[in-house]
Each structure stands twice: as C-alpha cells, then as structure tokens.
Amino acid sequence: MRGSSRFRPHEKLRASDDYQRVKRSGRRVRTAHFGVNFAANDLPHHRLGLVVQKRYWNAVGRNRIKRRIREWFRLNKTRIPAPYRDIVVVARPGAEKLSSLDVTKELLAIFLHKDGRIR
C-alpha cells in the first residue's frame, strides 16, 4: 500500500492564490454535504485543498471531517482520471456526521459517472 496510496505533501493545495484561482476559474459542484471546486493544473498529479469553517463545528468535528476527506482523496486519487486537477472541498453543515463510506460515495459521485467515466 505504499507509493501512490500515500497522501504526500506535494498533493496538498497550500497557497491562497491557488485556492482563489480554483474558486475563480474552476468548475463548481454542490452536494448535500459538500461544495467542490476543481480546475485543471499543469502538474503530474491531483492536489487537494480543504475548507472547513469554524462556525459550524468544534475542533473535534472539524478535524474529523478533514481526516475523512483526506482519506477519501488518498484512497481514490488514482480513480480520478487526467487531466490533473486542483480540488477544493468545502464542508457544509452535517458533513461531520457522515461515515467514511458516505464521504467516499458522495465525493466520488461528483467525479465519476455510473459507468466509471469522468464527468
């Protein structure tokens, strides 16, 4: 399980400018518990950024949902086909109550059709 299944530091979206670029020029999709913005990048891999607002949860809830989203990305990043993207996931109220399986189903449904193709 080593190698591509790890969540490496270069796969994290860090710079504020990158978050703004994805928000400005990227595609937006909303689900019941998440807002997802994504835009193509020029890198040989996907990158993940998280937005979890303090006003909705205490620290335990915020950290729980961030862990579950990172785990979804770590396990499924190879299932999201090229072009490689910067992905920003914004957690919405109620997301902290989702199981890891529910998070995976909801986020993966954004990127894949029922037959496995990218949207």
Swiss-Prot record:
Record's catalysed reaction(s): Endonucleolytic cleavage of RNA, removing 5'-extranucleotides from tRNA precursor
Enzyme class: hydrolase
PROSITE patterns named among the record's database cross-references: RIBONUCLEASE_P (PS00648)
One MF annotation (Gene Ontology) recorded for this entry: ribonuclease P activity
Annotated Gene Ontology cellular component terms: ribonuclease P complex
Keywords: Endonuclease, Hydrolase, Nuclease, RNA-binding, tRNA processing
GO BP: tRNA 5'-leader removal
Record's keyword annotation contains Nuclease: yes
Start and end residues of each stretch annotated as Disordered: 1-24
Keyword Nuclease found: yes
Biased composition regions of type Basic and acidic residues, renumbered to the chain: 8-21
Domain of life: Bacteria
Annotated EC: 3.1.26.5
Subunit record text: Consists of a catalytic RNA component (M1 or rnpB) and a protein subunit.
Name the UniProt record assigns to this protein: Ribonuclease P protein component
Lineage, opening ranks: Bacteria, Pseudomonadati, Thermodesulfobacteriota, Syntrophobacteria, Syntrophobacterales
